[in-house]
Amino acid sequence: MNLLDYLCQKESVSSVITSDRIKIGGTTDAWNMMLMACDFYQGNASVFVVLPNLYLAQNYYDELIAFMPEEDVLFFPSDELVSAEMIAATGDFLFERIQTLYTLLEGRKKMVVTNLHGAIKYELPLSCWQNNIFKLKQNDSVSIAELLKRLVRLGYEAVYTITKTGEFAHRGSI
């Protein structure tokens, strides 16, 4: 039995998780993460963890995937201020957000870690996401023009040469 399983079985932890109103102070981040993980595994719904800034959100995500299966934890980043060093990472953030939204549409419960800006940032309506999801299989026949339009609608960027995550290139005949 690991530490997480042990804590989730403790009556004191269960009473904290099931309480409608409770105020907890003076705890460590590690304890808070354990409580969130217990809440996630004992509950029937996704858990959203909103932290004040991107740095803390990234740290929580990294710590959570250290003791929870990585497929149960999603990262939904949003950069508040884009510095010169962060411009290259912005595409990675966009792809991470798209992947998180796509995974949430599958309907299985997940723990989603984000920062405040990520939680309040405007997103496309649910119907728009659902209408634009598609899967390609080997030997499928698709319209290239329609495929390119759909990729752009989903947030991918059309470029001549791919240099970062979230870009795609269309090559003509040779």
Feature map (PLM): residue ranges:
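ASCE RecA-like P-loop NTPase motor cores
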Residues: 1-174
